[in-house]
Design a protein with these regions (language model features):
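Bacterial N-terminal signal peptides
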Residues: 1-2
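N-terminal secretory targeting modules
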Residues: 5-119
């Protein structure tokens, strides 16, 4: 579970101690975290009205985005080059909890998260 320390208006690497991953993951020397198993999820608290992630994907994967326990939607991850993807925006002010969960089987793609940015 994520700790109570939230980040705001800054970028943090995926391996930050305030970001927790559940499932089989590979932590990289550059601060990125990769995974391909269905059901793997990342959870963290953040302060702000939006959150984005810098990701890459070997193949194609779908992830469900939950904010404060509510399913916000499903996002498609594609593209081998790192790029930014908005996970949620137009949220109320304050601290929120993000949960991003892979819902695609591993043979369809391997996801890598480099960082998160809250705004």
């Amino acid at each position: 579970m994520a700790t109570s320390v939230a980040f705001a208006d800054r970028t943090v690497k995926a391996n930050d101690p305030n970001i927790s991953f559940t499932g089989r993951v590979q932590r990289m020397d550059n601060g990125a975290v990769s995974y391909d198993w269905v059901g793997t999820y990342v959870q963290t608290d953040f302060t702000g009205s939006s959150i984005a992630a810098r990701v890459s994907e070997e193949g194609e994967s779908y992830h469900q985005v939950f904010i404060d326990g509510k399913l916000m939607g499903k996002l498609r991850f594609t593209g081998k080059e790192p790029h930014d993807i908005v996970l949620a925006k137009n949220l109320g002010k304050g601290t929120h909890r993000l949960r991003l969960q892979k819902v695609t089987e591993g043979e369809y793609g391997r996801s890598t998260i480099f960082s998160f940015t809250a705004g």
